């Protein structure tokens, strides 16, 4: 059957690629003629190549279906429907159904491959059986739906539904019954006119056969119900039992094929979605990166689907016994003839409007459907379809009498729907990558996924390709870069098969996950010793602590069978994590510049158990425990302040120890193991459990583990009995001689850089799982860097030498395992000077090379010139330069007493690192056993430096390195040195010219120039001041002159005023006796008016006033001016 499925998939893919002639012209646009791409349900793109979500094609198919319904006379089919004939015992249902299912599913997959949105109307019409019973049902329609003479009745149709629901619940017995049923009926062959509408449980894809296919759309719902009513009026009641028995035999024969078709079409839809994603990525510039992510998801699907069938059958069989008896008794009860006249009346305009509204909503209400389809939340989609199916079901139910409803099991829909819903959910839980991929959106607030570098998808988890990155605070940005790592605990992304990223989303390609599987297979092969209750079935859950989120409702320990793992699929993990990951981060405690500047001193509670032992948990308040577990998984860089006040109502008697993590003023975490060993001796761990004679004390066991096995912070396996014995029946004992023999090679080779050791990786993963599983008491979340406390000294050499750096934000990649400061954003000159001695030992021997661009990887720790792009292509391994001739100590092994013999990389004395030195390995092992740190550095700690005096390696053209030995990129080299005029003696010898002299000369010249500039500016300012002073003095003189002139003018004015007053008095006295007409005698009050009148009289000399004027002249003559 698998070969047939593959063959059908190949045929359908070829059919899907075959399109009408117009698709070749614009292969990236909608193939429907006249369609612009707008209004598509499946996405926002106008460049899809299929008809599956085109509203225009849907409308045309709808019109075609209506035209077929309105035809009054059609050519009758050679054979009648199976239900119309009553389906006798000898009617060959099984063999014919298999052939039809193969052809129909082939046509449906080729025509409407993965058409989930397009057939939403058909789902709503025929969903009652699927929504209630969760079973694929076949609806049969005759060639003449209006006036068919032999039509099936409502009773037989309802009995048929009950039989299908019952047979679906017996999925465990399908494999045996299929072979029997295939042999029972092989006689008649159906005609080509029979049309089957296969109702898929999740896809809802409709299939057509030949030119007589029938598509049921929402607008046709009223006609379909009426057709079913008219066709079923003429059937005799005696055919009910025959139809029921034959349909049960037919359904059992084809059920396995239908289930395979369901899985096949689901896979086809996934492949269609993958094709659409790949088409979009070709438009973008990150095609290779997204293809690698899709390969990860496909590999994860293959891994997860292996374990899913067991879970499905376990859940199916659990509900079979509860539902088998009532469902089987359903078809036996008789049912009177239903009244179908009521059905047409109940099918009112409201229902039709609702169907029309649902059809329009799939086209117009795009945002709602896009959100549902993008997230892939099948639960919401099923609820919507079930809701619509209930509306359609109300049309059929009023005409059915109570006896028939009880026959269908619809009187209590909850009882039938609930277990089948569970079966359906367990069936879809075997594809965790789809749910995880669609439910997790871009962490940028307000981002819908458009414009991303990695594709137009909102389900990525990183901020790397988000165009709205600038909207996010740097704290959240740095937090996501640190948190979103490989889901395998303890994995930094290094060594992955598909990429060296720490933000991948699957376990496929992870070397630690592979080691877990290998260790799990070894664990299964080990013989069980001791009491059978000491089950090792929980080893899988120990290796992956994320499963504790799902394992909240733990049954009693005795209910577990030996060697049987709990049936908890990891498929539901993404939904559980999304449910419990609604946490708030305390960004005030997060410092983006130096991670951990605040005094973080979390209490790390560790239990003295073996790496494989199952800790005793108290699940009395599993909701809080699940919340904290999900938070611990999703948030590894900040401490969760949302702690429940008490996660356990029982006293916690687990042996625990308090480890305070010290952070100095520079934000440096102390990762040494010796200080913690002293601290453990100073603060003994408190334990209320009585230790058996064969169990070491926590201090002694910890001391033993830290000295004999440096790669583990756990105690020896003999301390597994220290857990509480009242929680479990018996303590788990993994102290097997075979296990101890496997761990001996690890303890004897602590300096080996083997990342492929399954036992070492298994032990390390168990340790980090142990640190994450802290349900009881105060639940704290430690920084990801704190996990290096349990690593070996050899692993500390693989971290970034910058204090407080976890490897994120580096230029060469987001790796925490690089050994150089070249791309570290937190490194500065002071840190470079401090780490110069350590970084010089693990460099490429090529001068000026930091390890980037090498064929073997971006590592600075390689020991040969084989993959170095900067190495000379002359074939010389190491060409000694002048510097090496001057100082041959630079080309020797830095380990004191080593002559270069016995090295792993070759018998050369010219290497500069202790990575392959057997003497260094021996001394490092002795130092780790004695508890004292060993430094294999020679007395010459400076190492190869820039030959330019006073240069620390920063600012070079070829990189900011301390270890280059040439003047090629040195910014401090003098002009003569750059042209090669300086010899090696002149450059290197401090006797003739030291760096202080050079720097002093340059500083003196610069100071002299500055002094000259200051003098010039001072002189200019002095000249300006003199000019200003002269201007001020001249202005003061002018002011004095003006004041003197004003005084003179004032004096003149006073003299004139006195003279004027004297003249006015004389005039008054002279004219006192002369009176002008119409005026009083002159005085001081009317002096001005008198003078003006005289002036007018003299200007206008009137003959009448001549005498008066003469007299005035005579009187004024005596006045002297």
From Swiss-Prot:
Binding residue positions for Zn(2+) 1: 30, 35, 48, 54
Basic and acidic residues biased stretches: 62-71, 123-132, 346-358, 724-733
Protein localization: Nucleus
Pfam families per UniProt: MYT1, zf-C2HC
Low complexity bias: start-end ranges: 147-156, 705-723
Record: residues binding Zn(2+) 3: 486, 491, 504, 510
Compositionally biased residues, Polar residues: 526-540
Binding site for Zn(2+) 4: 800, 805, 818, 824
PROSITE patterns: ZF_CCHHC
Biased composition (Acidic residues): 258-308, 759-770
Annotated region (Disordered), positions in chain: 1-156, 200-376, 517-540, 668-774
Binding site residues for Zn(2+) 5: 844, 849, 862, 868
Listed GO biological process terms: cell differentiation; nervous system development; regulation of DNA-templated transcription
InterPro entries per the UniProt record, alphabetical: Myelin_TF, Znf_C2H2C, Znf_C2H2C_sf
Keyword terms of this UniProt record: Developmental protein, Differentiation, DNA-binding, Metal-binding, Neurogenesis, Nucleus, Repeat, Transcription, Transcription regulation, Zinc, Zinc-finger
Keyword check for Zinc-finger: yes
Entry binding sites for Zn(2+) 2: 442, 447, 460, 466
Tissue expression per record: Mostly in developing nervous system. Expressed in neural progenitors and oligodendrocyte lineage cells. More highly expressed in oligodendrocyte progenitors than in differentiated oligodendrocytes.
Binding site for Zn(2+) 7: 946, 951, 964, 970
Chief subcellular location: nucleus
Subunit composition and interactions: Interacts with STEAP3.
Similarity remark: Belongs to the MYT1 family.
Purpose of the protein: Binds to the promoter region of genes encoding proteolipid proteins of the central nervous system. May play a role in the development of neurons and oligodendroglia in the CNS. May regulate a critical transition point in oligodendrocyte lineage development by modulating oligodendrocyte progenitor proliferation relative to terminal differentiation and up-regulation of myelin gene transcription.
This protein's domain notes: Contains 7 zinc fingers of the C2HC class arranged in two widely separated clusters. These two domains of DNA binding can function independently and recognize the same DNA sequence.
Name of the featured protein: Myelin transcription factor 1
Species for this entry: Homo sapiens
């Amino acid at each position: 059957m698998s070969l047939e499925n593959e063959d059908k998939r190949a045929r359908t893919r070829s059919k899907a690629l075959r399109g009408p002639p117009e698709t070749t012209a614009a292969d990236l646009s909608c193939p429907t003629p006249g369609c612009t791409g707008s209004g598509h349900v499946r996405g926002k793109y106008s460049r899809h190549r299929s008809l599956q979500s085109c509203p225009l094609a849907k409308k045309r198919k709808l019109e075609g279906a209506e035209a077929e319904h309105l035809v009054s006379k059609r050519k009758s089919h050679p054979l009648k429907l199976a239900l119309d004939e009553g389906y006798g015992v000898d009617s060959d249902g099984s063999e014919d159904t298999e052939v039809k299912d193969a052809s129909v599913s082939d046509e449906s997959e080729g025509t409407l491959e993965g058409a989930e949105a397009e057939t939403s109307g058909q789902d709503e019409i025929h969903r009652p059986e699927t929504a209630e019973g969760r079973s694929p049902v076949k609806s049969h329609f005759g060639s003449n739906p209006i006036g068919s003479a032999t039509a099936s009745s409502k009773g037989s149709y309802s009995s048929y539904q009950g039989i299908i629901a019952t047979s679906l619940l017996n999925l465990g017995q399908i494999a045996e019954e299929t072979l029997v049923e295939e042999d029972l009926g092989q006689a008649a062959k159906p005609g080509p006119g029979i049309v089957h509408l296969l109702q898929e449980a999740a896809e809802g894809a409709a299939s057509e056969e030949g030119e007589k296919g029938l598509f049921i759309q929402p607008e046709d719902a009223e006609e379909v119900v009426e057709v079913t009513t008219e066709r079923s009026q003429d059937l005799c009641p005696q055919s009910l039992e025959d139809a029921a028995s034959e349909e049960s035999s037919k359904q059992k024969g084809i059920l396995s094929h239908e289930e395979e078709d369901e899985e096949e079409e689901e896979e086809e839809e996934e492949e269609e979605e993958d094709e659409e994603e790949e088409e979009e990525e070709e438009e973008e510039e990150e095609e290779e990166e997204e293809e690698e992510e899709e390969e990860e998801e496909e590999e994860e699907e293959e891994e997860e689907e292996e374990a899913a069938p067991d879970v499905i059958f376990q859940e199916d069989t659990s509900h079979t016994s509860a539902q088998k008896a009532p469902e089987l008794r359903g078809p036996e009860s008789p049912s009177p003839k239903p009244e179908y006249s009521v059905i047409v009346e109940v099918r009112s305009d409201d229902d039709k409007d609702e169907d029309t509204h649902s059809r329009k909503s799939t086209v117009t209400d795009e945002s709602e459907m896009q959100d549902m389809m993008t997230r892939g939340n099948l639960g919401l989609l099923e609820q919507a379809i079930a809701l619509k199916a209930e509306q359609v079901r109300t049309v059929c139910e009023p005409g059915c009498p109570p006896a028939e409803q009880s026959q269908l099991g619809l009187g209590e829909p909850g009882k039938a729907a609930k277990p089948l819903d569970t079966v359906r959910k367990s069936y879809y839980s075997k594809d965790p990558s789809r749910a995880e991929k669609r439910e997790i959106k871009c962490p940028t607030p307000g981002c819908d996924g458009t414009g991303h570098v990695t594709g137009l998808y909102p389900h990525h988890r990183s901020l790397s390709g988000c165009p709205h990155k600038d909207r996010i605070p740097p704290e959240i940005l740095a937090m996501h870069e640190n948190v979103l790592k490989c889901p395998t605990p303890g994995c930094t992304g290094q060594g992955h098969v598909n990429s060296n990223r720490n933000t991948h989303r699957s376990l496929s390609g992870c070397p630690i996950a592979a080691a877990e599987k290998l260790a799990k297979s070894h664990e299964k092969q080990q013989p069980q010793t001791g009491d059978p209750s000491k089950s090792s079935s929980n080893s899988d859950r120990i290796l992956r602590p994320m499963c504790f989120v799902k394992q909240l409702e733990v049954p009693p320990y005795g209910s577990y069978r030996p060697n049987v793992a709990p049936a908890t699929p990891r498929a539901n993990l993404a939904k559980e994590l999304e449910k419990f990951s609604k946490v708030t981060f305390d960004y005030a405690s997060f410092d983006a510049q130096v991670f951990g500047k605040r005094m973080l001193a979390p209490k790390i509670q560790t239990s003295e158990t073996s790496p494989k032992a199952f800790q005793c948990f108290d699940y009395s308040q599993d909701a809080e425990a699940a919340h904290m577990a999900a938070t611990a998984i999703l948030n590894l860089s900040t401490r969760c302040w949302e702690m429940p006040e008490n996660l356990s109502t029982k006293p916690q008697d687990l042996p625990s120890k308090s480890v305070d993590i010290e952070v100095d003023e520079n934000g440096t975490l102390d990762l040494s193991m010796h200080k913690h060993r002293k601290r453990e001796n100073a603060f003994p761990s408190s334990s209320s459990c009585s230790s058996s004679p064969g169990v070491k004390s926590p201090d002694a066991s910890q001391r033993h583990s830290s000295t004999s096995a440096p790669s583990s912070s756990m105690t020896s396996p003999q301390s597994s009995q220290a857990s509480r014995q009242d929680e479990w029946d018996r303590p788990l004992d993994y102290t097997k001689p075979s296990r101890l023999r496997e761990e001996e090679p690890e303890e004897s080779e602590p300096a080996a850089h083997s990342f492929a050791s399954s036992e070492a990786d298994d032990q390390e993963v168990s340790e980090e799982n142990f640190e994450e599983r802290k349900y009881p008491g105060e639940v704290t979340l430690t920084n990801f860097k704190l996990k290096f406390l349990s690593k070996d000294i050899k692993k500390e050499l693989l971290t970034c030498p910058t204090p407080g750096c976890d490897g994120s934000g580096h230029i060469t990649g987001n790796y925490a395992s690089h050994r150089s400061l070249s791309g570290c954003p937190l490194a500065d000159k002071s840190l470079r000077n401090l780490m110069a001695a350590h970084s010089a030992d693990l460099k490429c021997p090529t001068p000026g090379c930091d390890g980037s661009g090498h064929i073997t990887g971006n590592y600075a720790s390689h020991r040969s010139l084989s993959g170095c792009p900067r190495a000379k292509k002359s074939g010389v391994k190491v060409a000694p330069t002048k510097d090496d001739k001057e100082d041959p100590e630079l080309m020797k092994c830095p380990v004191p007493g080593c002559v270069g013999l016995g090295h792993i990389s070759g018998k050369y004395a010219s290497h500069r690192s202790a990575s392959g030195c057997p003497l260094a390995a021996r001394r490092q092992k002795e130092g780790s056993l004695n508890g004292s740190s060993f430094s294999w550095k020679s007395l010459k700690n400076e190492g190869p430096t820039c030959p330019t005096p006073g240069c620390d390696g920063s600012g070079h053209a070829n990189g900011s390195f301390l270890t280059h030995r040439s003047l090629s990129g040195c910014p401090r080299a003098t002009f003569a040195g750059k042209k090669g005029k300086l010899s090696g003696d002149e450059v290197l010898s401090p006797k003739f010219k030291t760096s202080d002299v050079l720097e002093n000369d340059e500083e003196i010249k610069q100071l002299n120039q500055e002094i000259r500039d200051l003098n010039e500016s001072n002189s200019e300012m002095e000249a300006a001041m003199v000019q200003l002073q002269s201007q001020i003095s001249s202005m003061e003189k002018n002011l004095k002159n003006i004041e003197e002139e004003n005084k003179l003018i004032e004096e003149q004015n006073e003299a004139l005023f006195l003279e004027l007053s004297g003249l006015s008095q004389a005039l008054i006295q002279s004219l006192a006796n002369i009176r002008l007409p119409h005026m009083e005698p002159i005085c001081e009050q009317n002096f001005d008016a008198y003078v003006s009148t005289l002036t007018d009289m003299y200007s206008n000399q009137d003959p009448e006033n001549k005498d008066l004027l003469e007299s005035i002249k005579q009187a004024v003559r005596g006045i002297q001016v």
